[in-house]
Amino acid sequence: MSFKVYDPIAELIATQFPTSNPDLQIINNDVLVVSPHKITLPMGPQNAGDVTNKAYVDQAVMSAAVPVASSTTVGTIQMAGDLEGSSGTNPIIAANKITLNKLQKIGPKMVIGNPNSDWNNTQEIELDSSFRIVDNRLNAGIVPISSTDPNKSNTVIPAPQQNGLFYLDSSGRVWVWAEHYYKCITPSRYISKWMGVGDFQELTVGQSVMWDSGRPSIETVSTQGLEVEWISSTNFTLSSLYLIPIVVKVTICIPLLGQPDQMAKFVLYSVSSAQQPRTGIVLTTDSSRSSAPIVSEYITVNWFEPKSYSVQLKEVNSDSGTTVTICSDKWLANPFLDCWITIEEVG
């Protein structure tokens, strides 16, 4: 019995490449394999000169160490520190990586921005009149109200549910909630001004300059800041009401007798909770001339003795008529020149 072992390589060499050496299995000419036929090498190379296959090359590339790129070496770009991703996936700055010490240092009282409509014009802008916020307003924590006094509003304004709110009334004043009522924190609230003959108004000694303090009586348990009269369900009597204390600034300007200049003096005093909501300022003289006019040029007062021009600033209760001295100074006033008083609420 005889048989033959088929050797495809030897057959290829013997039939296709007659000039090759079949014993050494050396191919001296080009090998042309017509599609779809191909030469398959299932094993990877063993020696340096061996032919290899695709699987071996792919594995070698995947496991190869690629150097970091430098000025002389081609390699990878290291995405470390503040950057994430890779050069092929659009690297971005990682979250919370830009800290203050990594920002550009700018000068004092400066911000970085674009001062005009030109693109790519980011620069330092000084915090002065050239710095503006366009189409944006600071309104957090500010509640506009339609009335001029939230304590006397026709519509109920509830007590704030949280502290730190500001209320802007229709006259531009700012209010805050003070436990039982709204308190105006805008300084120097103008109340009234009485002039002398220059305004064709006559202020006489003993005449009260009345003003509305703008603060109503409020029941102690009220949380709305409104004027109320609470009737007890037990004895049907009114509960105790109290007034909101305020601070009043009174400025008085009096032409002094025998002197060419006027004297201007202001005094601060508190309108306590024990007083009525309407209080007056009165100019008083000594008891001998309590009703003598001091600022009217139309009344002759030359026969008055100098002591009759001694005027003093007092407070009068509009209900009881009682007076309280709010300034101990007295002045000798010239009855032929104008006198005026300005009353302001300052606290």
Swiss-Prot record:
It comes from the Viruses. InterPro entries: DUF5907. This is Uncharacterized protein 008L. It comes from Invertebrate iridescent virus 3 (IIV-3).
